Structures are given as C-alpha cells and as structure tokens.
Amino acid sequence: MQPLRPSPAAGGWAGVAGVGPTTVDEASMERSKSFVKALQELKNLRPQLYSASEYCEKSYLHSEQKQMVLENLKDYAVRAVVNAVDHLGTVAYKLTDLFEQQASEVSTVELKVARLNQQILTCQIFTDRAGLRQQKIGGTTFKHHKHYILPSTGHKRTQAARLQTDNGQDSKPKPYPSAKTLSWHLSSENSISTTGAQKYTFTLGDTISSKPASNGSMYLLGKDIPASPMHKPLQPNGNTSFDAKKNVGSKDQPGFMHMSTFNALDKPRGREIQKVPVSTKSMLATLFIKHKSAKTRKASVR
C-alpha cells in the first residue's frame, strides 16, 4: 500500500491504494494536471475580488451602519489575500515539482546518452587496437633505419622463441638427411688430414701400391726397382739407401716386395730438430726412422 499524502491543490487526501499512479507517464500527467488546475484557480481570484469590492462599495453607500460594513470588508480582504497567497504557493509548488520531474528526466536521458557514448568509445578503441594488431602482423614499419635501431626485448624474446621452435623441430627425426653445416665440413677435413696419410698410394714406374698392412709395412707390386741416378739429385751426399725389414710371420708372395720403412735418405750430419710425431700413427711415421737408431747403427760400424 502507498502511504497517504495530502494534496495541496484540493486540500484533502489522495494516493489511496488503487487510486495512485502506476507508471511514470501517468504520474507526470497527474502533476501537469494539478499544476494547470492550481494556475486556473489563481486566475479565478481576480473576478471574485472585483465582485467583492463592488459589493462592499454598494453596501457602504446604502447602509446606515457603515462601521460594521468596514469591519466586514477588512475581514474579507484579509481572507482574500490569504487565499491568493495560498493559491500562489500551490502554483509555485506544482511548478517546482514539475520542473524537478523534467530535470530528473533530462538527467536520466543525459546519463543514458553518456553511457552510450562510453560504450561507443570503448568499441572504437577496441576496434582500433585490433586493426592495428592485424596491420602489424603483415610487417612493421620503422621510423629510423635498421642500423640505428637497437634490438628491443620483445624482438629478442621472439628470436629466442623461434630458436626454441627450430631446435624442437630439429630434435624430431626427419625422413630426409639434413644439410651439412660449415662446422661439419671443417671437422671432416681435419679428420681426413689426420687419417688420410694412411691411404696414400705410391706409383714407382709400373708398380702400384696396395693398402698398407696392419704393422705399417707396404707391399709394392711389380719388379724390384734398383736405385737409379735419377734419385741422386734428391740426396745431398749422392747416396741412396733403403732399409727394408722383413715382416715377421708373413709369407713372401711372388711379385710383391715387403718394405717396412725407408731410411732417412742419408740426412746431412749435424744437429737436427726432431719434430714431435702426430698422436695418430700415420704412414709418414712408419716411413722415417728416428735419428737415435741411425746413431746406434753408426756406432756399431765403427
């Protein structure tokens, strides 16, 4: 139930249950009607006051008790003024109520408009950001040249993420062999340089060397080639000598000659610098005899 409230226009009680307004439009309509009614009552005071003044004037002229007529006129004038002020207050109250109602409606509409503007602005900002993000996917345009731009942390993170993804893809088995890198080629060249000395083939005249034996000796195909004068320019003393050791436990085959090592080709006497042999046993290490063995052989000859 709605609480009872006095009506300043009618001076009675209104708003009884079932009589009051049910919607906002009906309430505003009733307020407008009450304001118009109060304004009309204020306008009706003018003819009433004119008729009261004429009556007082006639009664004062034709009556013998003029003093009594004056007192009644004073009381009527006071009541008329009070009634006029009351009507003015009612009209002012109705006007203020109507103005407040209109102001509240205007403020509500402004609030709704502001909310719609905020929603539109939010949608526009989101659309701009989404559009910029999509445009940046195609390619970023730098303000300065690339040489003068320091790499940002975000760029480093993206590079690190790409490297991680590449490593993850490389870790998976591939159906086809991967391309050889520069480090692989360098390591293969080094391995060939260290082990390639054991795979040399020598051609002496019509002879072709075969694969080296397990103990470092070399088998030469063909006839025995004696020392010829063509080898003398290679020797500083003019002597060419080959010391061949027989391979222990191996059988002599026809057409093959066992040669384990070559002598130092009569190196010149004097102090020589001995190079440190390579860690891996190669054919060059088996071809040359250490200088110490040459000294012991010379001592035995003496």
Curated annotation (Swiss-Prot):
UniProt keyword annotations, A-Z: Cytoplasm, Cytoskeleton
Compositional bias per record (Polar residues), positions renumbered to this chain: 161-170
GO CC aspect terms: cytoplasm; cytoskeleton
Keyword Cytoplasm: yes
Compartment(s): Cytoplasm, Cytoskeleton
Chain segments carrying region Disordered: 151-179, 220-256
The protein, known as: Probable protein ABIL4
Organism, scientific name: Oryza sativa subsp. japonica (Rice)
Phylogenetic classification of the source organism: Eukaryota, Viridiplantae, Streptophyta, Embryophyta, Tracheophyta
